[in-house]
């Protein structure tokens, strides 16, 4: 899967789950499970409930995503 295939959306973190997973509510109202991308994990970026984030979704599974950016 290339970078062109991903769907980027904005959302809000609802809660933190085990294993660095998060429940995120997208702007469209859907709730998904998302994990942190490698660069956020490497740089120790903390993600807390209530944070605005950018999520990448795969077109194959729209219920799971990857958090790629945390808004300031």
UniProtKB/Swiss-Prot annotation:
The places in or outside the cell where this protein is found are:
Cytoplasm
Q: Which family does it belong to?
A: Belongs to the IF-1 family.
- What gene does this protein come from? infA
Please tell me whether the keyword RNA-binding is annotated for this protein.
yes
Q: What does this protein do?
A: One of the essential components for the initiation of protein synthesis. Stabilizes the binding of IF-2 and IF-3 on the 30S subunit to which N-formylmethionyl-tRNA(fMet) subsequently binds. Helps modulate mRNA selection, yielding the 30S pre-initiation complex (PIC). Upon addition of the 50S ribosomal subunit IF-1, IF-2 and IF-3 are released leaving the mature 70S translation initiation complex.
Quote the SUPFAM superfamilies the UniProt record gives.
Nucleic acid-binding proteins
Ordered alphabetically, the record's keywords are: Cytoplasm, Initiation factor, Protein biosynthesis, RNA-binding, rRNA-binding
Q: What is this protein called?
A: Translation initiation factor IF-1
What organism is recorded for this protein? Clostridium botulinum (strain Hall / ATCC 3502 / NCTC 13319 / Type A)
Subunit structure of this entry? Answer: Component of the 30S ribosomal translation pre-initiation complex which assembles on the 30S ribosome in the order IF-2 and IF-3, IF-1 and N-formylmethionyl-tRNA(fMet); mRNA recruitment can occur at any time during PIC assembly.
Read off the SMART domains from this record.
S1
The yes or no answer to whether the keyword Nucleus is present is: no
Q: Name one GO molecular function term.
A: rRNA binding
Q: Where is the S1-like domain?
A: 1-72
Q: Cellular component terms, GO, for this chain's entry?
A: cytosol
């Amino acid at each position: 899967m290339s970078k062109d295939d991903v769907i980027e959306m904005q959302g809000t973190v609802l809660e933190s789950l085990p294993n660095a997973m998060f429940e995120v509510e997208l702007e469209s109202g859907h709730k998904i499970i998302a994990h942190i991308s490698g660069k956020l994990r490497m740089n120790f970026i903390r993600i807390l409930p209530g944070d605005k984030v950018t999520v990448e979704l795969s077109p194959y599974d729209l219920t799971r995503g990857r958090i790629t950016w945390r808004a300031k």
